[in-house]
Amino acid sequence: MTPQSATQNLSLRPGMKKRVGDKVGNIRLNAMDGSVFDLFSLRGRPYMLSFFRFASCPFCNLRMHELVSRFGELGERFTVVAVFDSPLDNLREHAERHHAPFPVLADERGIYYRQYGIERSVAGVMKGMILRMPTLLHALFGKGYVPLKIKGSMTTMPADFLVDERGVIQLAHYGKDEGDHLPFEAIKQFAERHPA
């Protein structure tokens, strides 16, 4: 291995968080629509790469609802890539109801979660349940996002990455608790700075 290739591989070590200025590597995963999604197919387009928890997570389903219902505000070129810590069949069971106009992927083995340094935290789960109780109750009882079948890690924390047309991360947001996603307004501002 040459020093250059060793340096390039440092960002792919498990547990290493991505930072602003890092280039994204390719992601190839099964999509909910039955295709195999290739992240490099988005070259030349800005997007948000969003890592969710397990497919029946109430906070995740509330976030998916927000992204789908407000997707039109992000412009024609901008898209979202949603990755879940669940098997494809479980993902379909819980996420198809959203009718997402963007790719929804299953990373059942957590390959890309490790590559992106996505954290697992029992404290983050507890913090989210306590500090976001009104949101959790709304998700459970207002929207019906009840996690009857949990397939995936319960301790996975969410993460969002805003990526420019060159495949460079412009913003990396690692959730501090189970419901901590990048605010929609930040996504919208980024999309507006990268118009069609």
Label every PLM stretch briefly:
Residues 52, 84, 164:
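Short beta-strand/turn micro-motifs composed of small residues
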Residues 178-193:
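A short, polar/charged loop-to-alpha-helix boundary motif
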Residues 39-68:
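Short active-site neighborhood of thiol/selenol oxidoreductases, capturing the structured segment around
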Residues 3-40:
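N-terminal "domain-start" segment that seeds a small globular fold
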Residues 63-115:
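Structural microenvironment flanking redox-active thiols in thiol-disulfide oxidoreductases
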Residues 24-25, 48, 157-159:
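Short loop/turn microsegments at loop-to-beta-strand junctions
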Residues 2, 7-9, 133-144, 192-196:
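Short, positively charged
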Residues 107-179:
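Thiol/selenol-based redox catalytic cores and closely related redox-interacting motifs
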